[in-house]
A protein has these predicted regions:
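Residues that define the transmembrane beta-barrel architecture of outer-membrane proteins
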Residues: 47-55, 80, 90, 100-106, ...
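Transmembrane beta-strands of outer-membrane beta-barrel pores
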Residues: 24-30, 63-65, 88-94, 114-116, ...
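Residues on the lipid-exposed face of transmembrane beta-strands in outer-membrane beta-barrel proteins
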Residues: 1-3, 26, 55-61, 108-112, ...
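A mid-sequence, solvent-exposed acidic-amphipathic segment
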Residues: 23-83
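Outer-membrane beta-barrel translocator domains and adjoining extracellular loop/strand segments
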Residues: 31-44, 70-73, 94-104, 131-138, ...
Length: 159
């Protein structure tokens, strides 16, 4: 689900390129336990697979929308095709020993959108020690197959 702010009044026109999206959903494991064999110790280890709730949201600012529908502020390529994005993907444990604990990251980044592809780059910052201790990097390469092949893959199935 999401909401763009293109309907804001003229006095708030520079906020119109903002959008927020969100997601929430339960995760149920197909097996309640994992059984692993430790070759070093010769012991069998049993770990629980908890039920979790995945939730999160993104905050986005589209420089494409700003340039096209609010005001052309003179951004040149490649900046006029960028979207500033911060993702907040989270997971809450609902069962087992981790019940109530939250893990997640904050992922500030940018996405460049072209006619046939988009590229993105973001930092991945853990929100707590359960999530991790180091900052990571996320990359995105997305090809718009329907635009690359509009007469075959991109064509309607039924006419």
């Amino acid at each position: 689900m999401g909401k763009g702010f293109g309907d804001l009044p003229e006095s708030l026109k520079y906020l119109r390129p903002f959008a927020i999206t969100g997601v929430v959903g339960p995760n149920f494991p197909t097996q309640s336990n994992n059984v692993t064999f430790n070759a070093d110790t010769g012991e069998t280890e049993i770990g629980q697979n908890p039920k979790t709730l995945t939730w999160g949201f993104t905050l986005q600012y589209s420089l494409i929308y700003l340039q096209s529908f609010v005001k052309d502020i003179g951004l040149g390529a490649p900046f006029n095709r960028m979207i500033l994005v911060t993702e907040f993907p989270m997971e809450t444990c609902l069962s087992a020993d981790c019940k109530g604990q939250i893990t997640g990251t904050v992922n500030p980044g940018i996405v460049w959108v072209g006619k046939y592809t988009e590229f993105g780059l973001a930092a991945q910052i853990p929100i707590n020690s359960r999530t991790g201790k180091s900052v990571g990097v996320l990359g995105l390469i997305h090809f718009f197959i329907d635009d690359l092949f509009p007469k075959s893959i991109g064509a309607p199935i039924f006419h």
